[in-house]
UniProtKB/Swiss-Prot annotation:
UniProt KW keywords: Chromosome, Coiled coil, Methyltransferase, Nucleus, Repressor, S-adenosyl-L-methionine, Transcription, Transcription regulation, Transferase
Reaction catalysis annotation: L-lysyl(36)-[histone H3] + 3 S-adenosyl-L-methionine = N(6),N(6),N(6)-trimethyl-L-lysyl(36)-[histone H3] + 3 S-adenosyl-L-homocysteine + 3 H(+)
GO biological process, one term: regulation of DNA-templated transcription
Family: Belongs to the class V-like SAM-binding methyltransferase superfamily. Histone-lysine methyltransferase family. SET2 subfamily.
Coiled coil: 770-806
Function: Histone methyltransferase that trimethylates histone H3 'Lys-36' forming H3K36me3. Involved in transcription elongation as well as in transcription repression.
Sequence ranges of Low complexity compositional bias: 111-122, 831-846, 959-972
Protein name in UniProt: Histone-lysine N-methyltransferase, H3 lysine-36 specific
Gene this chain is encoded by: SET2
Species annotation: Mycosarcoma maydis (Corn smut fungus)
């Protein structure tokens, strides 16, 4: 259409059209009302009751600050309508040049040309563009509502300072005031195990436990230890400890009381201030709520620290108490693990400009009386603060939304709501779809799980995501981010919640492990064992042992060293709040399967090196070193001390779990420190089948050959074979002496069992039973035993002489296990001789005696297995107890005394007729009473050892003799 460009529109017509567009925009988009209210000539609507109408911006001026997308005109504006439309525009690609023909007045430079020259400034085409833009704005109201503009920060530079008046309203404290020393400490072993992997191998301080270094402590909101971090004083993850606060001003607001204003530009993730106050339990918290309601205190100063523990900064606190609420906050509150306590810090959620008011969302963290009207003045204001539930998306922290993987969905569906629209609630009118964790989400998920606290709905979904994750790399990341310590914490907190417990067990069953040390050190194995006992169906008279187990695990380590452990009160009793759960066979069975899978892992004390885990690395167990968790973290020669490439994971808590790991267990048992004799031929031809029919090449020429007895279906081992294997094994290791002699007794008794059927065979092979007489067999066996005994005594004597000459500190204390070994040798020798003499008489007896011999052989074999199990259980307790004194002992001394103490305790236990052999046959676990007594005995031993060490090197030898003698007191 050919329009007449010479038609001139008056400036009044242009102004009216522009005003119509602005009014249409007002009815569609309700953004940034604070700036609108602060400008002259604009009346607020009935919904615009912003408390920051004058507190959010400087006083009105002829040149109000426009959005940063364009440059304001130097000439004053005759009308505020174009500027109002400009401030409320959702389009930011405007051009500052006045000569450019704008798409709409919303994109203009904020000023109009003089009315005296309307022809040169605006023509008919421009007016038509205005009409078209007005129609487009009205037609696209829904799209304008969904387009989220970038909200401009609220500056409060004009507000007056109120430092003195504000500080007079409360008592300022530097650190939290704990009503009880047990408060503020999360359950779990968070003392010596929260060490990061950062390596100070460069001079770049930006890598000193910062966001750029990938510090696992910083990523999981744990502050590094000032004394144990490898970066030392250069560590930048000690902000709470060093009180590295940002400079802030306390100002007087119009409707919100006092507030905080930034005195400098604050980058994102910066630590601003710690929120300190009185830490109290839930009972005191409820009393304080009632008291403050009576006193008329309506401001919110309560924060939940952890379940049943609250932080009150009403009358005691710091400057952080003055931070106000906002529905569009620039700060966030996070709970950090600092030493043994949980502490709350205020962090920058985004980049903050100088002069902004510092705010965070009270609906997320704070607790107060009834819901109150919100005065934040933000466009996305929900109208009230307080009165929100844990499932309200409007009050949910962005950390949880990101960890659940629903941030984008919540933003797109406007699930948080606004002042005119109610927000949605999780699992009620907003049901998210959970998915497996991606590798880049691992940090957020683990941090959110630590912060979940009483938010059960959120925690359950996070655990569900962990359970769904099958990616091995993601599972390794979860383990590295203190995963096992987190699970131990959650099991203590949610021990009576059946669904949460099942999820945690399923997650643990999928996490990879190199050795069993980690689950023992962090205490998660004890928690799973308690769950197995708690949920196991039992009769009413069996309830007391389960309660004793709960008290035993919860008691303090120092109190556990005493014998009378039943009188010790639990140190973390408030955690066990709630009724015990109902017995559940499924939970108990899954916990038992998980424990059995963990038991199949080795208990090692060395770093998992790649070269040490190769198949050709022979005798790698001989080179193991007893180290602690911190020692493994401090190893300078390893880039990755937590290498999980060769880790094993229980992939399912079921019967297939044990079958999958049994093969690995057999492979680990192939290379012991000493070679035991071959298994007794209880199953005919079993060795030949396993070895492909090959003949054992260790047999001497004059002994029976297995192939000569294959026709009778038997292949028994002769005493020559037994003693030959015994002597060869004794040369390799002295520690196998006692067990080898017992195995020899088993072989001799088995010989007696197998020989009578061989004599009753037809005369087709008469040479087999008559190759040697019974007297020759006994004589040769005795000669071999005597030679083996002399070789063992010579080796023991040489070892003792080497110990005496090697150092005075361990000379006398190491004689005691050797003496016990000699007594065991004598007893084993007498028993073997008696067995040999009895074999001659029983060979001519009836076949009924063979059945008795079979039962005796089985009992001897079970005793040997029980001894190995006892040594393993005692060794674990000894190493764990001695690790408390790791700083006072050198590594070699630690190893030596740990072995001595283990041998001493095992010897005492086996010499006690009341407890050995076990009454129920196979030994599975030590009783709680036995574990407590072993700990007490170990503590007494270590105390005497450290006392002798403190007297000086000159008096170490006589002190050792005295300590060795005194430590012979029985533990049972």
């Amino acid at each position: 259409m050919d329009w007449d460009h010479n038609v001139t529109f008056s400036a009044v017509r242009s102004l009216q059209a522009t005003t119509a567009v602005a009014q249409a925009t007002d009815n569609v988009v309700d953004l940034d009302r604070n700036r609108v209210d602060s400008r002259p000539g604009v009346l607020p609507t009935k919904n615009e009751s912003s408390p920051h109408s004058s507190a959010s911006l400087p006083p009105p001026s002829p040149h109000p600050p426009p959005p940063p997308a364009f440059t304001p005109s130097p000439s004053p504006s005759p009308s505020p309508s174009p500027q109002t439309a400009t401030a409320r525009s959702s389009v930011t690609d405007a051009a500052p040049a006045p000569k450019r023909s704008p798409r709409s007045p919303l994109h203009s430079n904020g000023s109009f040309p003089p009315v005296s020259d309307p022809i040169s400034s605006i023509d008919s085409r421009d007016a038509l563009d205005i009409d078209h833009e007005s129609t487009a704005m009205l037609a696209s109201s829904s799209s304008a509502r969904k387009s989220k503009p970038k909200l401009q920060p609220q500056l409060i530079n004009h507000l007056p300072l109120a430092q003195q008046a504000a500080m007079a309203t409360f008592h300022e404290i530097t650190f939290n005031d704990y009503h009880d020393k047990k408060l503020g400490r999360p359950p779990g072993k968070f003392d010596d195990y929260m060490i990061c992997d950062c390596t100070p191998n460069s001079g770049n301080l930006d890598m000193a436990c910062t966001d750029y270094s990938g510090c696992i402590n910083r990523m999981t909101q744990i502050e590094c230890s000032a004394s144990k971090c490898r970066w030392g004083k250069q560590c930048r993850n000690q902000r709470f400890h060093r009180r590295q606060y940002v400079d802030v001003d306390i100002v007087q607001t119009e409707k919100k009381g006092f507030g905080l204003r930034a005195c400098q530009d604050i980058p994102k993730e910066t630590f601003i201030y710690e929120y300190v106050g009185e830490v109290m339990n839930q009972t005191t918290f409820l009393q304080r709520m009632q008291q403050y309601r009576i006193e008329g205190i309506r401001h919110f100063y309560f924060m939940m620290l952890q379940p049943n523990e609250y932080l009150d900064a009403t009358k005691k606190g710091g400057k952080g108490r003055f931070i106000n609420h906002s529905c569009n906050p620039n700060c966030a509150v996070s709970k950090w693990q600092v030493g043994k306590h949980l502490r709350m810090g205020i962090f920058a959620k985004r980049n903050i400009q100088k002069g902004e008011e510092l705010t965070f969302n009270y609906n997320v963290d704070r607790y107060g009386n009834d819901a109150q009207e919100c005065f934040c003045g933000e466009p996305n204001c929900v109208g009230t603060l307080g009165g929100k539930t844990q499932t309200d998306l409007s009050g949910m922290d962005d950390l949880f939304l990101d960890a659940l993987g629903i941030s984008d969905e919540v933003e797109q569906t406007e699930a948080k709501g606004s002042r005119r629209k109610r927000g949605k609630r999780l699992d009620l009118d907003f049901i998210p779809q959970m998915r497996a964790i991606q590798e880049h989400e691992a940090t957020r998920v683990m941090t959110a799980a630590r912060q979940a606290g009483p938010k059960r709905e959120i925690l359950e979904k996070l655990l569900r995501r962990m359970e769904m994750t099958t990616d091995v790399n993601v599972q390794k990341s979860l383990v590295k981010l203190h995963g096992f310590i987190l699970m131990q914490f959650l099991l203590e907190q949610w021990w009576n919640d059946r669904d949460i417990v099942i999820l945690i067990i399923n997650v643990l069953a999928r996490w990879p492990l190199i050795a069993r040390n980690k689950v023992i050190d962090c205490g998660v194995e004890d928690q799973v064992r308690i769950l197995a006992q708690t949920y196991r169906p039992r009769s009413p008279e069996d309830q007391k042992p389960s309660l004793d187990a709960l008290r035993q695990v919860k008691q303090d380590d120092s109190a556990a060293d005493r014998n009378d452990y039943t009188q010790v009160q639990p140190t973390l009793a408030p955690v066990r709040i709630g009724a015990p759960p109902a017995p559940d066979a499924e939970v108990s069975a899954r916990a038992e399967h998980l424990l059995e899978a963990w038991k199949k892992l080795d208990m090692t004390y060395r770093i998992a090196r790649k070269d040490a885990l190769k198949p050709d690395a022979d005798d790698h167990k001989d080179a193991t070193a007893v180290t602690t968790w911190i020692d493994r973290r401090r190893m300078q020669d390893l880039d990755d001390p937590l290498d999980l490439e060769h880790a094993q994971a229980p992939n399912a808590v079921s019967s297939e779990l044990g079958n999958a790991l049994s093969g690995d267990q057999e492979l680990r048992e192939i290379k012991p420190s000493w070679q035991p004799p071959p298994a007794p031929p209880s199953m005919p031809n079993a060795p030949a089948k396993r070895m492909g029919g090959a003949v054992h090449h260790r047999s001497p020429p004059g002994s029976f050959t297995p192939t000569r007895l294959q026709s009778s279906g038997q292949s028994p081992l002769t005493p020559d074979q037994v003693t030959s294997v015994l002597s060869s094994s004794l040369v390799k290791s002295l520690s196998g002496l006692v067990s080898s002699l017992k195995q020899q007794g088993i072989q001799l008794q088995q010989q007696q069992q197998q020989q009578p059927p061989a004599q009753q065979q037809p005369s087709a092979q008469p040479a087999a039973p008559s190759a040697k007489s019974i007297e020759d067999i006994i004589r040769e066996a005795n000669e071999q035993e005597e030679r083996a005994r002399k070789e063992a005594e010579a080796a023991a004597k040489a070892a003792r002489e080497l110990e005496v000459n090697g150092g005075q500190t361990s000379g006398s204390s190491r004689k005691r296990p050797s003496s016990a070994s000699r007594h065991s040798d004598k007893r084993a020798k007498h028993s073997s001789l008696s067995s040999s003499s009895q074999a001659a008489s029983k060979l001519i007896s009836s076949n009924g005696s063979a059945a008795d011999s079979t039962s005796k052989a089985g009992s001897v074999e079970s005793v040997a297995a029980n001894e190995r199990r006892l040594r393993k259980l005692v060794g674990e307790l000894v190493v764990r107890q001695m690790s408390k004194y790791k700083d006072d002992l050198e590594r070699e001394s630690f190893k030596r005394h740990a072995k001595e103490l283990t041998n001493a305790i095992v010897g005492k236990e086996m010499r006690n007729p009341k407890s050995w052999p076990p009454a129920r046959g196979a030994l599975t676990e030590l009783s709680l009473d036995k574990r407590a007594k072993i700990k007490a005995f170990a503590k007494e031993y270590i105390d005497k050892l450290l006392a002798r060490k403190g007297k000086g090197k000159g008096s170490s030898t006589p002190s050792n003799n005295e300590g060795a003698g005194s430590s012979n007191n029985g533990i049972v």
